[in-house]
């Protein structure tokens, strides 16, 4: 049975400092078993993940605190990045032992170890975690004119009606080929920079912009050419210049695990004038791919033959993407990009990611490297390898899918403590710089629209039904109320709040392609958009929301209250996700507070603020500590 009074890895009474620690630093452990249980010795037993070495350290009986004996020890963390999996062995004077792990006391059974992340402390650009990110699917954001797809790679066609639904019905071969385009462009994004600045955006994350046969452009055809339907390299450079003038940076999507079968590197259909790997074993790109046998059978991303997988360990490929003086990574940083998001980081070797980081630091020292990782990035195992994403010299931050999953569950009737547990686990496991640099989001191009998820009663089983699905007025109202709460939490939680284009405008839609419709210019939900803009303004105005310490105040049932504290300033987010009012006495040993959302003032009585939170409502309380 678990007894947090004996040891709680998240309490500084038991372990200090909290969470992950830099290489070579000291970690103090206190274990407090009941004195009557007769333990005379306590040993910390730790296993190093990467070397396999076992560490044993004796904790010494230091004092008796009431009914408990306190054992204390100081561990020096390894000098190299590592994951330590530890538990305690307690020994009585008669030689009998007991094991203490995350599940509690163990006599026998599989050990459920605590995790200690040991990382190499490196510089992390602050502009990402301290900013507001806006994700754009370029083909669907803003069209200035109807493009002509004639002569471009892929059998493309363009919707004349911007408000059409993206094609989802398979062709006669049973494939959805994503060849329908809407004509959004880089110049269209540039034309909307003032709107984005007014929304509070400081970082643009663009889905792939390089020449590709498909509208999503994840099947890259030419890494060094902007897709002509989006514009030119000069258009990209101008976008970056104009964005910089408004305090906005641009991050690009790097798809480096696979290319398109119609790319100039593979060239399966002979579209490009050069010789691709599918055309000749003498192709300069032949060694980039793994054939068995050539030319029809080859490794492909998840077995999708239009996405041939590249061999990242091939020196020529690494030179092209990373090492060369005009490599893909370096070229686009010099053209104005401020960072890269690595698509499918699990598919890339650790040393490949580390080389990208090095090339970025050499080319643009303040650039940011983000990774697509769907789980806890410190415990992720891919292809039987424990990954080192956040241990130093790889990723600065990752996409925070666990945040989205936990937040949706809470807002749809789950327990606030489950949300706390999910995020507190990440906070404990991640280096603090990485936790503050997480890309927190409510939706992306790979997830259903957040308004639909929060408003719908259930997910239709049939894709045709999902294509035709629209929230009823009652469902939409509930969804909007929940979405306002989701945005409140998103913008006040540690990490970079990220808005998927159109979520702030109340766009609906299930999965791809229904979540990738054209932005509804002049048809937005202006109230919701103003709410997002106001939250972004608060985040910009109060540094505490960017780097402040996180405190959990109340996490029970439908009530979620957490605070951020920095340099004497305190902001608390209070949310009631229930369909009924909730009354509580909020502990508040501080001066009177003001709700930034309504201007209402609250005066504490006996170090508490009496609150009644209406159904599906929230507050953002601000005060200055004495």
Where are the language model's segments positioned?
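Glycan-association/targeting regions that enable binding to alpha-glucans and other polysaccharides
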Residues: 1-134
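Carbohydrate-binding surface patches
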Residues: 16, 28, 553-587
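Conserved, mostly hydrophobic/aromatic
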Residues: 31, 136, 196, 206, ...
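C-terminal beta-strand-rich structural cap/linker in extracellular carbohydrate-active enzymes
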Residues: 35, 605-626
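Substrate-binding/active-site clefts of carbohydrate-active enzymes
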Residues: 137-202, 209-335, 356-362, 379
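Aromatic/acidic polysaccharide-binding cleft in carbohydrate-active enzymes
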Residues: 139, 383-384, 436-471, 487-525
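Active-site-proximal helices and loops of the catalytic beta/alpha 8
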Residues: 240-249, 257-258, 263-274, 328, ...
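C-terminal accessory region downstream of the catalytic core in glycan-modifying enzymes
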Residues: 521-542, 585-606, 615-617
């Amino acid at each position: 049975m678990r007894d947090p009074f004996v040891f709680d890895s998240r309490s500084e009474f038991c372990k200090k400092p909290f969470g992950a620690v830099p290489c070579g630093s000291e970690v103090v452990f206190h274990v407090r078993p009941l004195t009557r249980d007769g333990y005379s010795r306590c040993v910390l037993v730790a296993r190093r993940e990467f070397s396999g070495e076992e560490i044993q350290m004796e904790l010494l009986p230091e004092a008796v605190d009431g009914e408990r004996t306190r054992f204390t020890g100081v561990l020096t963390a390894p000098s190299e990045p590592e994951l330590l999996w530890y538990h305690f062995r307690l020994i009585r004077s008669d030689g009998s032992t007991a094991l203490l792990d995350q599940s509690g006391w163990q006599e026998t059974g599989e050990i459920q170890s605590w995790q200690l992340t040991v990382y190499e402390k490196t510089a992390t650009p602050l502009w990402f975690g301290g900013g507001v990110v806006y994700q754009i699917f370029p083909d669907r954001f803003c069209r200035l004119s109807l493009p002509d797809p004639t002569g471009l790679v892929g059998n493309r066609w363009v919707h004349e009606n911007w408000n059409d639904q993206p094609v989802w019905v398979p062709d006669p071969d049973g494939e959805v080929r994503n060849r329908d385009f809407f004509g959004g462009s880089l110049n269209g994004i540039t034309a909307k920079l003032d709107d984005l600045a007014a929304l509070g955006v400081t970082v643009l994350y663009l889905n792939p912009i390089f020449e590709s046969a498909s509208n999503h452009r994840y099947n890259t055809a030419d890494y060094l050419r902007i897709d002509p339907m989006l514009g030119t390299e000069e258009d990209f450079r101008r976008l970056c210049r104009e964005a910089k003038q408004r305090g906005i940076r641009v991050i690009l999507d790097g798809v480096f695990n696979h290319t398109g079968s119609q790319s100039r590197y593979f060239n399966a259909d002979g579209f490009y004038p050069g010789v691709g790997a599918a055309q000749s074993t003498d192709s300069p790109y032949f060694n980039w791919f793994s054939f068995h046998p050539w030319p029809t059978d080859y490794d492909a991303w998840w077995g999708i033959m239009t996405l041939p997988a590249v061999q990242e360990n091939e020196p020529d490929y690494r030179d092209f993407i990373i090492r060369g003086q005009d490599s893909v990574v370096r070229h686009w940083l010099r053209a104005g990009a401020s960072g890269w998001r690595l698509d499918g980081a699990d598919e890339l070797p650790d040393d490949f990611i580390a080389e990208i980081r090095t090339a970025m630091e050499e080319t643009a020292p303040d650039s940011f490297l983000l990774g697509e990782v769907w789980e806890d990035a410190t415990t992720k195992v891919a292809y039987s390898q424990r990954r080192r994403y956040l241990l130093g010299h790889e990723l600065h931050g990752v996409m925070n899918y666990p945040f989205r999953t936990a937040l949706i569950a809470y807002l749809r009737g789950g327990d606030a403590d489950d949300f706390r547990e999910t995020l507190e686990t990440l906070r404990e496991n991640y280096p603090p710089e990485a936790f503050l640099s997480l890309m927190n989001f409510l939706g992306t191009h790979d997830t259903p629209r957040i308004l639909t998820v929060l408003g719908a009663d259930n997910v239709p089983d049939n894709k045709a039904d999902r294509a035709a699905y629209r929230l009823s007025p009652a469902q939409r109202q509930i969804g909007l109320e929940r979405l306002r709460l989701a945005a409140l939490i998103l913008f006040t939680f540690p990490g970079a709040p990220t808005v998927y284009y159109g979520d702030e405008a109340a766009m609906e839609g299930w999965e791809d392609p229904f979540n990738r419709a054209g932005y509804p210019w002049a048809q937005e939900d202006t109230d919701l958009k103003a709410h997002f803009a106001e939250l972004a303004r608060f985040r910009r105005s109060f540094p505490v929301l960017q780097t402040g310490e996180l405190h959990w105040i109340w996490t029970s049932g439908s009530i979620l209250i957490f605070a951020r504290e920095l340099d004497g300033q305190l902001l608390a987010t209070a949310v009631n996700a229930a369909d009924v009012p909730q009354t509580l006495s909020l502990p508040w040993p501080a001066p009177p507070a003001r709700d930034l959302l309504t201007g209402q003032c609250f005066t504490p009585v006996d170090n508490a603020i009496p609150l009644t939170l209406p159904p599906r409502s929230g507050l953002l309380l601000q005060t200055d500590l004495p």
